[in-house]
Amino acid sequence: MAEVLVYVDHVDGAVRKPTLELLTLARRIGEPVAVALGNGAADTAATLAEHGAVKVLTHDASEYADYLVVPKVDALQAAHEAVSPAAVLVPSSAEGKEIAARLALRLGSGIITDAVDLEAGDEGPVATQSVFAASFTTKSRVSKGTPVITVKPNSAAVEAAPAAGAVEALSVTFSAQATGTKVTGRTPRESTGRPELTEAAIVVSGGRGVNGAENFAIIEALADSLGAAVGASRAAVDAGWYPHTNQVGQTGKSVSPQLYIASGISGAIQHRAGMQTSKTIVAINKDAEAPIFDLVDYGVVGDLFDVVPALTEEIKARKG
């Protein structure tokens, strides 16, 4: 069976959930070979093996932390030369999509971004994408070179499948471009205790209808009662009510949680583009004609200032 390269997203050896989802999808089309880079790379091996990696290629160098994405592209290119894989899978984060695009260019290959499913095909892996605000589902394959595919978080359930997970050192020669853009400093974000927006199983978002930064407290309260991440529409972000890092939509982040609750969001196509692949969508809006209701599984026509606090209290009561 052909091998499939999986780029590992980890923090000092702690593997992030989207990578485990990639391993599940990779097993459908071949044998997963994980590529772990940077500090703690070797510490990822046990987790990766538990979830199906037959091999774990590791390489640690200061360049991965000191410079932007090019060193990681160099490493993936080296892994591609060592393995000759059937495909390369990368998490569909902002960094992941840049890595994938640069790698595809170097390999002279095609790229598919924001896939929500993956299956084996007679002529190579077939990726499913949700497009035009979930109006259509497309199936695509790369017709030239090794397919490079980014997959959206929450596209697959994480499934354990113990494998050998043999650790091998990857030999990497960095290109001249690798050190072209140096990281001069990092400012840690203040922790809210909530899950990462793009990885959360539940997302509660507020829009123009929240009508003020101070009113986002009721959105946060509902999110905290559910253990959810907080999102915001572009209108809310542009008004200065919530940080841009929490914006969901075409010019923000793309999410695909199990449950998405839209409060006071009309449902412009730009917002829908960022949450259309959510498994279950609930909308709360006092305008019964709001476009968001065309997309939802469950809709509540009502004032969010009445509905959201009542929902929060009911959830708390049921949780005891």
Enumerate the predicted regions with their spans.
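N-terminal glycine-rich FAD/FM-binding segment characteristic of electron-transfer flavoproteins
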Residues: M1-G320
